[in-house]
Curated annotation (Swiss-Prot):
Alphabetized Gene3D superfamilies for the sequence: Zinc/RING finger domain, C3HC4 (zinc finger)
Complex formation: Binds RAB27A that has been activated by GTP-binding via its N-terminus. Binds MYO5A via its C-terminal coiled coil domain.
Annotated protein name in UniProt: Melanophilin
ZnF endpoints (FYVE-type): 64-107
Species the sequence originates in: Mus musculus
GO BP term, pick one: protein targeting
Keyword hit for Iron: no
Amino acid sequence: MGKRLDLSTLTDEEAEHVWAVVQRDFDLRRREEERLQGLKGKIQKESSKRELLSDTAHLNETHCARCLQPYRLLLNSRRQCLECSLFVCKSCSHAHPEEQGWLCDPCHLARVVKIGSLEWYYQHVRARFKRFGSAKVIRSLCGRLQGGGGSEPSLEEGNGDSEQTDEDGDLDTEARDQPLNSKKKKRLLSFRDVDFEEDSDHLVQPCSQTLGLSSVPESAHSLQSLSGEPYSEDTTSLEPEGLEETGARALGCRPSPEVQPCSPLPSGEDAHAELDSPAASCKSAFGTTAMPGTDDVRGKHLPSQYLADVDTSDEDSIQGPRAASQHSKRRARTVPETQILELNKRMSAVEHLLVHLENTVLPPSAQEPTVETHPSADTEEETLRRRLEELTSNISGSSTSSEDETKPDGTFLGGSPKVCTDTGHMETQERNPRSPGNPARPTKSTDEELSEMEDRVAMTASEVQQAESEISDIESRIAALRAAGLTVKPSGKPRRKSGIPIFLPRVTEKLDRIPKTPPADPDDQAKMPKATTAVPSLLRRKYSPSSQGVDSGSFDRKSVYRGSLTQRNPNGRRGTARHIFAKPVMAQQP
């Protein structure tokens, strides 16, 4: 890009946006500079106090070098500073664990100023990036915003940022030395300076109307308040002449400022080097205040005539031919549209950085409350559905068993669509609730379906947790058996089904109808139903009246082993059970 910056093709909204961002940047820099100046004043006071105490070195052995309090053994111990090697008390020192020592308050403040000013960083930026600055942006935008009520920035403000440029810095320093009432010298300076001529070639935008002279005193007073220089009649006489000339030149321009080609933009490195800087250097002084007309400008339609070269136009005989040649050059230039997109991206990045800096520098009461953006209901529903699909796919093995268990209860029959691992099948079932395969199912809202899916997922997760607890219980039993010296070797063959029949409720009802006392006659015993004969002797003994008062502990096993049910005697089983254990669990001799 070089030394040229043309923002004349920006719309009014974009120009206001850029102006507001740059003003926030200046405001934050000024606040940081004021804070650092206060710290510098404290350092100067402490240094003067230290000079007075330097003559009495013996006094520092017994008293603090800062507050002159006497040292005490436990209450107010003596500590030596790492920088100045003076002794200070406990309340006047700061601990530095990384250096394993102490610093007195003046030395600590000096370090804070050195780190907070970032002088080393800005020196590196000035040495590397020399072609862009916030002063150029303000100089390019001040004409448009001045017409809508905004004030023109002072020369000192432009000089604060123009230290990062080569020839632009020389221009700003020379312009600051010149008083505002010497219009002839300013005219000669503007024509002799080549850089300002190149910049002023791009600082004019077509307009639809001529600016009135009523805004001239306001701009002059605002210029006086910002720059601190006296206000004179020569400046007001200079500005109407410039307004008349610019109005005459604007008659042949295009009427609409919104249909304009895009402007050349600064490179990415230069933009971030200047606009992303959080605080100004210690050498640059920002004596400006926030622009008073920026709030009023946003609610109005601003005229788009630039006043950047008003100061350089006070004689029609000299400026007239030059203005015609400049207009012919401006019409011939075309700029790609990609650069305006790059500027928008950079300005958004600068805005994010400025918000972060405002949160750091400004107090919490001055910060505006942030507006939370709530996602739409469709987005929340989509994310919740996606999470439910992930959960159901993770526990697909246990979800099928949970559905089989819930079928006898009748809880989920005829309810919401079945949770499947195939997400596509589930979505088709949800979208077509009245499909031919499921005609009787009532239509339900999305919230009900999601709640049912959540209940089903929770039930499946609880069943998985219960199965895991059972597995851990079995593993603990196996570990206990192994700790007892037993080797458990599971058989590779499938388990043999238990020979003990499982009786349904019908069988228990028939058991209630069985006579209390079994018939002694074998003929009557043969007439009993088959279910009664199928009951083993254990159940018969349980339901018989003779066993009601007998304790269950008096039951006699036929096997010689008396142990727990998990440790069965392999000798009492048939031949297929010998493969389960390699040796008997425990053999007790009778």
